[in-house]
């Protein structure tokens, strides 16, 4: 399972003109389930995300986690993170989990995030979404927990 994290001062996702999720300071996590992923990979990814030290401490060093700063978490499903662009000019998404598996893992990830962290907002799985953000830094970090079958 993978995520592209962006440290933000604010972020919002809308579907059909209606806001489905919005946060202030925190992390925007674009999340993708890959072929072979299970809840175990989702849990490991979430644990890493919540503890990743990407926020400044008193000295200005990236030394504090999302949990430590009490920031928001906006989780948006994005299967295109699994794109394979090695052949030709059209990306292949064959590495992404099937839609039903992707939805189940996304919902599991969000449920666990809500159980472990205070402020969690989301997009809508499978919808055409517009994501607005102000990237702070900019800080953008890819995370990937490979499926156990690929290890």
Curated annotation (Swiss-Prot):
Give an example GO cellular component term for this record. Answer: cytoplasm
Intracellular or extracellular location(s): Cytoplasm
> What catalytic activity is recorded?
glycyl-tRNA(Ala) + H2O = tRNA(Ala) + glycine + H(+); a D-aminoacyl-tRNA + H2O = a tRNA + a D-alpha-amino acid + H(+)
Which Gene Ontology molecular function entries are recorded, alphabetically?
Answer: D-tyrosyl-tRNA(Tyr) deacylase activity; Gly-tRNA(Ala) deacylase activity; Ser(Gly)-tRNA(Ala) hydrolase activity; tRNA binding
Tell me the domain of life: Bacteria
For this protein, the record's Pfam families field holds: Tyr_Deacylase
Q: What is known of its domains?
A: A Gly-cisPro motif from one monomer fits into the active site of the other monomer to allow specific chiral rejection of L-amino acids.
NCBIfam families cross-referenced by the UniProt entry: D-aminoacyl-tRNA deacylase
In Swiss-Prot or TrEMBL terms, this protein is called D-aminoacyl-tRNA deacylase
């Amino acid at each position: 399972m993978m995520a592209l994290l962006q440290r933000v001062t604010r972020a919002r996702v809308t579907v059909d003109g209606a806001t489905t999720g919005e946060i202030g300071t925190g992390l925007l996590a674009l999340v993708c389930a890959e072929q072979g992923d299970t809840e175990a990979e989702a849990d490991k990814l979430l644990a890493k995300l919540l503890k990743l030290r990407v926020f400044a401490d008193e000295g200005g060093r990236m030394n504090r986690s999302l949990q430590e700063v009490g920031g928001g978490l906006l989780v948006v499903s994005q299967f295109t993170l699994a794109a394979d662009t090695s052949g030709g000019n059209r990306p292949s998404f064959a590495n992404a989990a099937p839609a039903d598996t992707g939805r189940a893992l996304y919902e599991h990830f969000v449920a666990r995030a809500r159980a472990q962290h205070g402020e969690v907002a989301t997009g809508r799985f499978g919808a055409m979404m517009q994501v607005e953000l102000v990237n702070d830094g900019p800080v953008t970090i890819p995370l990937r927990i490979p499926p156990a079958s690929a290890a």
